[in-house]
Amino acid sequence: MARHSIKMIALLTAFGLASAAMTVQAAERIAFIPKLVGVGFFTSGGNGAQEAGKALGIDVTYDGPTEPSVSGQVQLVNNFVNQGYDAIIVSAVSPDGLCPALKRAMQRGVKILTWDSDTKPECRSYYINQGTPKQLGSMLVEMAAHQVDKEKAKVAFFYSSPTVTDQNQWVKEAKAKISKEHPGWEIVTTQFGYNDATKSLQTAEGIIKAYPDLDAIIAPDANALPAAAQAAENLKRNNLAIVGFSTPNVMRPYVQRGTVKEFGLWDVVQQGKISVYVANELLKNMPMNVGDSLDIPGIGKVTVSPNSEQGYHYEAKGNGIVLLPERVIFNKDNIDKYDF
């Protein structure tokens, strides 16, 4: 009888140790995927995501393709799902190209969120959104209008690709605003750098050479904007208004030299943090619905908005958009206050 009891105790002890080990292994893991690695904007977002992970006791992995491709992102998504990750947060290179992989992941219980660039809303739970297309499109035009003060002007648009979700939405709104509020502005070309620094510089120089009387380049892309600024310096075009979106650390020398008077962005480190906090809430508690809020340390309250804020026609429970609290216009007076 005593021997039987000892065996039972040993079995229970072993079971307890195994359960404890399983509990340790069951700590949540979140994958944070950019459009591509090696770009300061995305690295900063990844830093914010990993900082939030440390604060929450969550393992956050930052990884992305070396080139912005649907196939590269799909491969990463599938790999993370097969490795047992609990949530995936992705900046999508295509609104629909990732959807089959993301829907399969959701069917396996993986929580899916997007940040920076969205998919179709039915392919994720929440989009951590830097601003609505109307907000960001208006911001682009207003920055250009601060410098182009003549009624008739020639404007070029220059960004990453014709298929990327976010930038095309902003540009669509920007062009609509130009048509309505600046009918004398002629949009002479729309070109793409495909998230490649060398190609972006070549494309920017090509635009400036092809349109010697160009008044402004609007470049809402982290590679395109510094490329446009460098091209203007290389070709000694000092009278060209260059505006768009990029990080302050990348753009600081161009602002200090006066090549770029102002440009915009949002706190992408904050965007990474918010993404992980929302994913953590989704993993630990009930899904948030439109109107629900979450308090994030050091940031404040964020609220779930309907997908219609982004122009979508899809709404569902546990699905929506989380807008960043603010956007920033950087210039020589404030750029040194930021480090990302």
UniProtKB/Swiss-Prot annotation:
One of its GO terms (molecular function) is carbohydrate binding. Belongs to the bacterial solute-binding protein 2 family. The keyword Signal applies. Residues 1-26 form the signal peptide. SUPFAM superfamilies: Periplasmic binding protein-like I (SSF53822). The complex is composed of two ATP-binding proteins (LsrA), two transmembrane proteins (LsrC and LsrD) and a solute-binding protein (LsrB). InterPro entries: Bact_Solute-Bind_Prot2 (IPR050555), LsrB (IPR030159), Peripla_BP_I (IPR028082), SBP_2_dom (IPR025997). Keywords: Periplasm, Signal. Part of the ABC transporter complex LsrABCD involved in autoinducer 2 (AI-2) import. Binds AI-2 and delivers it to the LsrC and LsrD permeases. It is found in: Periplasm. One of its GO terms (cellular component) is outer membrane-bounded periplasmic space. The keyword Metal-binding does not apply. This is Autoinducer 2-binding protein LsrB. It comes from the Bacteria. It comes from Salmonella choleraesuis (strain SC-B67).
